[in-house]
UniProtKB/Swiss-Prot annotation:
InterPro entries registered for this protein in UniProt: Ribosomal_bL35, Ribosomal_bL35-like, Ribosomal_bL35_CS, Ribosomal_bL35_sf
Protein name: Large ribosomal subunit protein bL35
BP term (GO), one: translation
Entry similarity comment: Belongs to the bacterial ribosomal protein bL35 family.
Domain of life: Bacteria
Ranges where the record places region Disordered: 1-65
Amino acid sequence: MPKMKTKSAAAKRFKRTAKGGFKSGNSFTSHRFHGKTKKQRRQLRGLSMMDKSNVKRYKKMIPAK
């Protein structure tokens, strides 16, 4: 059976955690910050955990090493 290929688009956008979940960057963070409050900007920093309902789909896109 051939090896599963990693979807390169998914690999660029998501990072796998030690427990098998996924982290991703937040949307709405590239420009137009003048329309967002200080609290919104602060909460959009860093990575956020992906919802559990999507994890199964992304595990197929990014197979384990």
